[in-house]
A protein has these predicted regions:
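N-terminal glycine-rich FAD/FM-binding segment characteristic of electron-transfer flavoproteins
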Residues: 1-167
């Protein structure tokens, strides 16, 4: 089987669109084998309504024997009532141009005012101003919101690769 990786659009037939050069350009590619394996970028292709199904849930007890690891605390990132980043329709994102974590209230205030989800650039998550689950870009979460507002972000191609599906 042939492989077409990173598909961003899949019209009818065996022709596909995929990003190249870290999202700076797109290429039209065509599958040339009878069988194709296709991978998509996150949220690139919407799900038709009503195609979901239920799955059976089966409980079981795992025998872990002598545990060498002890879980002290488990926590999920708080989304503060906002849509999960990969599904968000409105996103307000910021970068190092905010000059410090003490200025992040501006981003939160704007996001709250318009009902958006917050995001950040990789440098912001790397230096610890924001949690890594808010990092959008080539090495973070790829998003496709209807509106993407970037504040203090330089626009590096790695960042743009994760937000180029924004409308």
């Amino acid at each position: 089987a042939g492989l077409v990786a990173g598909v961003t659009e899949a019209p009818e037939g065996a022709q596909f669109t995929r990003n190249v050069f870290s999202g700076k350009a797109s290429a039209q590619v065509k599958g040339t084998t009878d069988k194709l394996v296709i991978t998509t970028t996150p949220n690139a292709i919407g799900m038709p309504e009503g195609t979901g199904a239920t799955a059976a849930v089966e409980a079981f007890n795992a025998d872990l024997g002598d545990r060498k690891v002890e879980v002290l605390e488990a926590a999920q990132p708080s989304t503060e009532g906002r849509a999960p980043l990969p599904e968000a329709e409105l996103v307000v994102s910021a970068g190092r141009g905010m000059k410090g974590p003490e200025n992040w209230g501006i981003v939160e205030g704007l996001a709250d005012a318009i009902g958006a989800t917050t995001a950040c650039s990789r440098p912001v998550s790397d230096i610890g101003w924001r949690p890594h689950h808010e990092h959008v870009g080539q090495t973070g979460i790829a998003i496709r919101p209807n509106l993407y507002i970037a504040i203090g972000i330089s626009g590096a191609i790695q960042h743009l690769a994760g937000v180029n599906g924004s409308k």
